[in-house]
Amino acid sequence: MAEEVKFSPYEDAVAGLVVQILGRTGVAGEVTQVKIKVLEGRDKGRVLTRNVKGPVRLGDIVMLRETEREARRITAR
């Protein structure tokens, strides 16, 4: 009865490649909205729009805990 032990909540994370930077969002512009191409897993090849906190640039690899949710588009008020 060997159970698989998870040491980190991020073990199920999926790698994604930043392919386009769409803009900044958040009250102080601390979040960057980017398009990410999923590199592995069941959604391999899918392009998602996600919000990323912290420094990010084209070509960066981002680890996604889940690949089902997408961020809403940035709209001008």
Curated annotation (Swiss-Prot):
Official protein name in the record: Small ribosomal subunit protein eS28
GO process annotations (BP): maturation of SSU-rRNA; ribosomal small subunit assembly; translation
Alphabetized Gene3D superfamilies for the sequence: Nucleic acid-binding proteins
Record family assignment: Belongs to the eukaryotic ribosomal protein eS28 family.
Keyword Glycoprotein in record: no
CDD domains: S1_S28E
Pfam families, per database record: Ribosomal_S28e (PF01200)
One GO CC annotation: cytosolic small ribosomal subunit
Native organism taxonomy: Archaea, Thermoproteota, Thermoprotei, Thermoproteales, Thermoproteaceae
Membrane-crossing segments per the record: none
Keywords for this protein: Ribonucleoprotein, Ribosomal protein
